[in-house]
Amino acid sequence: EILSGLVGSEMCIETEPYFLHQKELDPTYIGTTTVQKCVRTNDIDNIGDARHLSFFEMLGNFSFGRYFKKEMCAWAFEFSTEVLGLPKEKLYFTVFEDDDETIEIWKSLGVAEDHISKLGEEDNFWRAGPTGPCGPCSEIYFDQGPEVGCGKPDCKPGCDCDRFLEYWNCVFTQFDGQEDGTLAPLQTKNIDTGMGLELSLIHIS
């Protein structure tokens, strides 16, 4: 049994038993939060560009069936605009290509439709590995301005340039990936987020 780790690689292994309901959180709490020290291994070749560090701290919040998309999106938007003080016109959002529900939630919070992009499984469906808890995700980006971009008229989040910098990933962990590639619904719909501490500090400085 893994109780904790010194460092991770952008996944919180301690929460998996709770997503699978092998363990239960004290019902007094609606979720839990973490600060995780991470070392990049999955994209080590990208270290040194303007978007990737070899080491960073990831802030996370997790829910095991107590809240889901509507609450998470509202809190993420509120925290970004009211606590961090980021101007909402600088915020852009990506969603999984089949997730129209999350698009409507962002729009209901006042996000302009042209600030929301659909991306495919590679970008907006999060998996810890070939099997286990997984689900579509919605990422929040900060627009650093056209002066650091590629100059292309269709530049948007997901572009390889440095204009749009992702700082928060909200994962809607609702499936259990099987060895045959199928997705079995989990017992509850859950939340797993990761916010880059250093990237967030860049945006508010």
Indicate where each model-derived feature is located.
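Single conserved hydrophobic/aromatic residue that forms the stacking wall/gate
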Residues: 1-7, 12, 202-203
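Charged, often glycine-rich, active-site loop that binds/positions anionic groups
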Residues: 8-13, 102-106
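RNA-binding basic/glycine-rich loop and surface signature characteristic of RAMP-family CRISPR effectors
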Residues: 15-16, 171
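N-terminal structural subdomain of ketosynthase/condensing enzymes
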Residues: 17-39
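Short, charge-rich binding segments
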Residues: 29-31, 45-48, 83-85
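Residues forming anionic-ligand binding surfaces in small-molecule and nucleic-acid pockets
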Residues: 35-64, 182-184
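Active-site cavity-forming subdomains of large catalytic enzyme subunits
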Residues: 57-73, 79-201, 205
